[in-house]
Every structure is written in C-alpha cells, then in structure tokens.
C-alpha cells in the first residue's frame, strides 16, 4: 500500500485528491497538511473531503506528516511547493507537484530537491491535457513555420496566476517543436500599436471569469485554413485522478524531475 500525504488538504483540489486517493486501490491517505492558522487544523481529512472519517488529522507542518509516507501530493502555491520539496528531500519522500506559477528560481530549487528524491512536476495533471501537449508537438512539427501559433486560455475568476502554467507549457511545446527559444518566442496579452505580428512569435492570451475550471485552445493559423486543438476541463476530478496516478507511479523511481508524459508513457520513460 502506497501511503500518501496531501497538502492543501482542505482546499478545492485537496479535498478532491483525498477522495480520489482513498478510492484508488493500492493508495491510502496517511497524512494531511494545511497552512498554519487554518480552521481545518485538527479535523479529520476524510470528513473535510465529505466522506467517512479516515483517522487522519490535518496538521500545519509537513514534516509532522512525513513519517512512514511514500509520496506527497502538493497542489498549493509555488512558494509553498518549494518548501515542501525541501522537506521531502530531507525526509527521503517522493513528491508530486501540481502547483503552477513557478519562477525560474523556484523551479531551480525544486530541481535541487529532486537530486535526492523523485519529483513529478507538471502544470496540469489531466491525462487529456498531456495528450494535447503531444498533439500540439506533432502539429507544430508537421505544419511548420507557415502557420502562426496563438494560445487562448480561460479559468475561473479566483485563479491567481496568469497565464496558466498549462498555457505556458503549450507555448513552450510549440516553440521547441518549431526550433524556437521559448523565452524569445512567447508573447503575452498584446496591447497598443505594435505593428505587424512577427512570424516567430507565439501569442498567449488570458481570460478570467465565473467558475470555468479550465479551457485551452491552440490555434495554428495558416493561409486559407486554421487548425484548433482544444481541451476543456469540466471538473477538477480529472486533475485529482492524474495526481493519484502519478502518486502510484513515482515511489521507487530514481531521483530526478519527471512530468506526466513520463507517468503516462507518452515518451521514453526515465
């Protein structure tokens, strides 16, 4: 039985993950963590998730929950995820990170922790989205420089980072497939008199409103035709399912940074 600690256990994603982990054969919730001062501290993680008690009380310090754990699932913030990665590295516990908004410095700190333990770092745990990453890669390679690439994403009004980590990753995938440096190619939310669109540019536009779980469309705009690849998330459950799948796959892997393509076998695994 793989023992799983869930951070952010009282949040929207955390409660979904607790429910999915307890329903997944071979996985068990062994720990639950929330921020200091949360009203969830001391409460049962199973009850908070809307189910029967698990006998797992929510604590305010990840280190307290790591004893005997095999893997941590972390959907919090990139700042908290860095601290959690460092705690997991110190304890020798694998880590699945679904947080977004990572800065280069934060990613470097996660990579440093991954020198000691295996880490899955993915901006989107959905199986469907990770298939879309591969479809975009293939489309960019086949269509080439004759098609302009644009990305539009929309999420609920409570999402704090923009653009989404998934939109950025879609842009990176397209840029890499076209032989462009993502740092140079990606352009965000245009405004003003900018002149003609540079042919090497990949635009990313952000929308926020309502209760939209998540939608991403990649446009390949050519002369006389347009190809669109779209993914629509209608429930957070599919993110939790992907995270549970990653948690079952990761323990026992060599230290290093993995992503969902590795988990799903979409390319040669590490």
UniProtKB/Swiss-Prot annotation:
Pathway in which the depicted protein is active: Amino-acid biosynthesis; L-lysine biosynthesis via DAP pathway; (S)-tetrahydrodipicolinate from L-aspartate: step 4/4
Domain of life: Bacteria
Disulfide bonds: none
Active site residues of this protein: 155 (proton donor/acceptor), 159 (proton donor)
InterPro entries per record: DapB_C, DapB_N, DapB_N_CS, DHDPR_bac, NAD(P)-bd_dom_sf
Keyword Phosphoprotein: no
Residues at which NAD(+) binds: 8-13, 34, 98-100, 122-125
Keywords: Amino-acid biosynthesis, Cytoplasm, Diaminopimelate biosynthesis, Lysine biosynthesis, NAD, NADP, Oxidoreductase
Recorded GO MF terms: 4-hydroxy-tetrahydrodipicolinate reductase; NAD binding; NADP binding; oxidoreductase activity, acting on CH or CH2 groups, NAD or NADP as acceptor
Annotated residues for binding of (S)-2,3,4,5-tetrahydrodipicolinate: 156, 165-166
Main location: cytoplasm
EC number: 1.17.1.8
GO biological process, one term: lysine biosynthetic process via diaminopimelate
Keyword Metal-binding appears in the UniProt entry: no
Reactions listed under catalytic activity: (S)-2,3,4,5-tetrahydrodipicolinate + NAD(+) + H2O = (2S,4S)-4-hydroxy-2,3,4,5-tetrahydrodipicolinate + NADH + H(+); (S)-2,3,4,5-tetrahydrodipicolinate + NADP(+) + H2O = (2S,4S)-4-hydroxy-2,3,4,5-tetrahydrodipicolinate + NADPH + H(+)
Any single Pfam family the record assigns to this protein: DapB_C
One Gene Ontology cellular component annotation held by this UniProt entry: cytosol
Compartments (UniProt record): Cytoplasm
UniProt-annotated binding residues for NADP(+): 35
Similarity comment: Belongs to the DapB family.
NCBIfam families in the record: dapB (TIGR00036)
Protein purpose: Catalyzes the conversion of 4-hydroxy-tetrahydrodipicolinate (HTPA) to tetrahydrodipicolinate.
Protein name: 4-hydroxy-tetrahydrodipicolinate reductase
Provenance organism: Anaeromyxobacter dehalogenans (strain 2CP-1 / ATCC BAA-258)
Phylogenetic lineage: Bacteria, Pseudomonadati, Myxococcota, Myxococcia, Myxococcales
């Amino acid at each position: 039985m793989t023992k799983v600690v869930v951070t952010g256990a009282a949040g929207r994603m955390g409660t979904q993950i607790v429910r999915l982990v307890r329903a997944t054969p071979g996985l068990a919730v062994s720990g639950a963590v929330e921020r200091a001062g949360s009203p969830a501290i001391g409460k049962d993680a199973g009850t908070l998730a809307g189910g029967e008690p698990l006998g797992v009380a929510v604590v305010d310090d990840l280190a307290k929950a790591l004893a005997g754990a095999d893997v941590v699932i972390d959907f919090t913030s990139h700042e908290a995820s860095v601290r959690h990665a460092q705690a997991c590295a110190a304890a020798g516990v694998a880590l699945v990170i679904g947080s977004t908004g990572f800065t280069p410095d934060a990613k470097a700190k996660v990579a440093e922790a991954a020198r000691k333990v295996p880490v899955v770092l993915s901006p989107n745990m959905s199986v469907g989205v990770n298939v879309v990453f591969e479809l975009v890669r293939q489309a960019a390679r086949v269509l080439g420089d004759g098609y302009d690439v644009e990305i539009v994403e929309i999420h609920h009004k409570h999402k704090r980072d923009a653009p989404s980590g998934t939109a950025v990753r879609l842009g990176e995938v397209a840029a890499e497939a076209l032989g462009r440096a993502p740092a140079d190619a990606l352009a965000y939310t245009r405004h003003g008199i900018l002149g003609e669109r540079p042919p090497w540019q990949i635009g990313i536009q952000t929308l926020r409103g309502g209760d939209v779980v998540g939608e991403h469309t990649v446009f390949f705009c050519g002369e006389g035709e347009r190809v669109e690849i779209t993914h629509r998330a209608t429930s957070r459950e599919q993110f939790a399912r992907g995270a549970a799948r990653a948690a079952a796959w990761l323990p026992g892997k060599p230290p290093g940074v993995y992503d969902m393509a590795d988990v799903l076998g979409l390319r040669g695994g590490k």
